[in-house]
Amino acid sequence: MFYLYIPFHGIESRLPDGFDCREDAMQAAQSKRVYGYCVCDGQGNFVWSPAGSAVASHILYHAKDVADYMREHGYKYGDADQNPALDKHSENPEKIVSCDRFCGWVLYEAGYTEHQPPRKGLPLYFSPNLEEFLVASGFARIDDAAKVRPGDLIFEGDSHHMPPALPEPYRGYPRHVFINAGPAEDGLFYRYDAGSDQRIQSVQPMIERLSKPEQGRYFRFAFRAPERD
C-alpha cells in the first residue's frame, strides 16, 4: 500500500486512505503538491515527492502552515522588532512579519534553527542577513530562472530600482523574497509570500508570475535547500 504523508513528520502524518497502485498515490500527491504532500509506503518510508525532493515538500508544508497561522492570528506587514518564528511563543507577540521574516520563520519550522537571531529575524532589504543564513545552512544558489523548483526561495529586484539617494553598498541587495510552490497554468506560479498586508491576509498559496519586471521585481537568483536524511 502507498499513502500520502508529510516527509520528516513520521508515519503519523500519513493520510488514512491508502492506494494499492503507486501511480494512483503519485497522482493524488500531485493534486496536493503545493501543501507538501509526498508518497510513502506502508512503513512510512519516503517513495516520491511531486516537488522534486522530500526537503522541498517539507518546506512547502511549513510555508502553508505558517501562512495559515499568520492569517488566522491577525499578523500585519512591517519591520518586525522580534524574530516572528520565536516571538509567536511569547505572552504578547507583536504579530508583525514581512517577506524575509516569513521565509526565515518557515525555515525555522522546517528545522533550520541554528543561527536564527531572536531579534529582527533574517532581514533582506538593504541587508545580507538572509542570504548569509542560507549559505551557512548549506543552501545552493540558483542563477537561472528556468531552473527554479518548488521549495526554492526566489529573490527579486536590484539596484536599478533603488532610491537614488541610497548609499552604494546597499544598492545591490534584492528587494523581495518568496517561496516558490511550483508552476500553475499559463506561465504562472504558485507562491507563498508575506510581502504586504494583502498577501498576509490572503489564503495561500497565491498564483502570480515568477517575476514582474515592470515593477522592478525581476528574478535575481534563488536558493535551494540541501538534501537531508
Where are the model-predicted features located?
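Extracytoplasmic/periplasmic, Sec-exported soluble proteins
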Residues: D17, H58, E91-C99, D143-A146, ...
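Surface-exposed loop/edge segments in extracytoplasmic proteins
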Residues: I11-D17, F46-W48, G187-Y190, R199-S202
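Active-site signature of cysteine proteases
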Residues: D24, E185-D229
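Short aromatic-glycine-(Arg/Gly/Cys) micro-motifs in beta-strand/loop hairpins
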Residues: M1-L15, S31-Y37, G42, F46
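N-terminal capping segments
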Residues: S53-P117
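Short amphipathic alpha-helices within nucleic acid-binding modules
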Residues: A25-A29
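...with weaker cross-activation on analogous glycine-rich loops/strands in unrelated enzymes
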Residues: T113-I200
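Conserved beta-strand/loop element in small beta-rich adapter and peptidoglycan-binding domains
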Residues: G18-E23
